[in-house]
């Protein structure tokens, strides 16, 4: 339940209280990958964001790779906002994001293929929203009316999903999750031969009921 104990420490409940410059950094394999984008979208103070491939580690460690010169970026940021040195750190893109390419699943934090993109504003007019509707055991771009889907997930489901907060630099990332799919209720879209680049925060709307305590 989202009561006052959660609201008190939640940034999303009080963006207007953030009045200092913000350098937001996270990784797509971290447990908080969406925070950077939300800060860029809602904070009125000077704000820049960096989202890389790494997990819950400093970007200069870069696990998974590629890393960045985070120490240099942090030093330039502090020189600008703590020492009032006009060093052009705000001339960089508001969002620097690593677009990961498709790769075979491996829990080992090796280098991830992809490329860095500089995004001039967020939300970006170059990013469009794609809506996919749940249909019986599939995804569809058109609305499909169906009554219900029953879900029963054994407690041992998701053993191959990886750690929630990968930090140790060992085999913590998702591996082939075919065995978990076999135990799950899945909604899969058709195989596409078109290039699809994803950048943003996924959102799902569900209506859920439970017949057990």
Which residues make up each language-model segment?
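C-terminal, loop-rich substrate-recognition/catalytic regions characterized by aromatic stacking residues
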Residues: 64-213
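Active-site-proximal cap/loop segments of hydrolase catalytic domains
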Residues: 1-90, 96, 102
